[in-house]
């Protein structure tokens, strides 16, 4: 496929090593702006979203002096970010914390290809939420469906755990294999959160007001990923991801 050249910044290995070795801050607010000066009334250089990592050049008043990967510099209000190592000490990897983050995105609109708090598709929601917890996993639902421990879902859902990923799509037939086209995060009590039109909670239980018959009928299986964190190549905290550790 193709991407706008202005949307990426090419780097050599040496440049990537320098970027990774530099002090960084992580955006902790849903979104914020980088300004030309340490003054929120000055012109904006760029917007940034949750989990963005920026090079830390210094501090000025209540602002971080930061650099973007393309070399632009500006000032980010400190209230919207934390130094990388300090942020890592605050991040949790348990299911309930991850579900709470997913719920905080409730109402965010669906956008195909979206991978930020501005808009997300189904797998983009999963990836964005986990990135906000310093975890990287594959981008697309069809890729995520191959990661972790495969779970054939019991009729009463009793073998599912909060934090499992639940997958939907076309069921397998004698002629064709199953085709994954949707994913959500299981919350427990037969409920899951996903991005379909917008981010919201649905239920497999016909007695619940959030009952989702459409998705129940196309439910395929689940994948358990959190116990496999940093034990399999596809699910890692970012301090173990090769991209952030170019040698």
Predicted segments, located by residue:
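Short, flexible active-site loops
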Residues: 103-114, 144
């Amino acid at each position: 496929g193709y991407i706008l050249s202005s949307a990426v910044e090419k780097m050599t290995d040496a440049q990537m090593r320098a970027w990774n070795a530099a002090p960084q801050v992580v955006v902790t607010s849903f979104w914020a702006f980088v300004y030309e000066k340490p003054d929120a009334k000055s012109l904006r250089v760029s917007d940034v979203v949750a989990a963005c990592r920026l090079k830390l050049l210094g501090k000025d008043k209540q602002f971080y002096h930061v650099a973007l990967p393309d070399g632009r510099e500006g000032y980010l209000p400190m209230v919207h970010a934390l130094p990388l190592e300090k942020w890592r000490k605050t991040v949790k990897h348990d299911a309930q914390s991850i579900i709470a983050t997913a719920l905080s995105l409730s109402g965010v609109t669906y956008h195909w290809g979206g991978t930020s708090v501005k808009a997300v598709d189904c797998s983009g929601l999963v990836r964005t939420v986990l990135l906000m917890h310093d975890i990287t996993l594959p981008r697309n639902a069809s890729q995520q469906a191959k990661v972790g421990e495969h779970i054939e879902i019991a009729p009463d859902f009793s073998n599912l755990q909060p934090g499992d990923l639940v997958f939907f799509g076309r069921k397998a037939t004698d002629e064709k294999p199953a085709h994954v086209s949707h994913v959500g995060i299981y919350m427990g009590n037969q409920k899951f959160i996903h991005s379909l039109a917008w981010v919201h909670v649905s239920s497999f239980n016909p007695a619940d007001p959030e009952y989702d018959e459409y998705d129940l009928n196309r439910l395929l299986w689940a994948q358990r990923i959190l116990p496999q964190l940093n034990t399999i190549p596809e699910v890692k905290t970012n301090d173990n991801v090769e991209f952030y550790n170019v040698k």
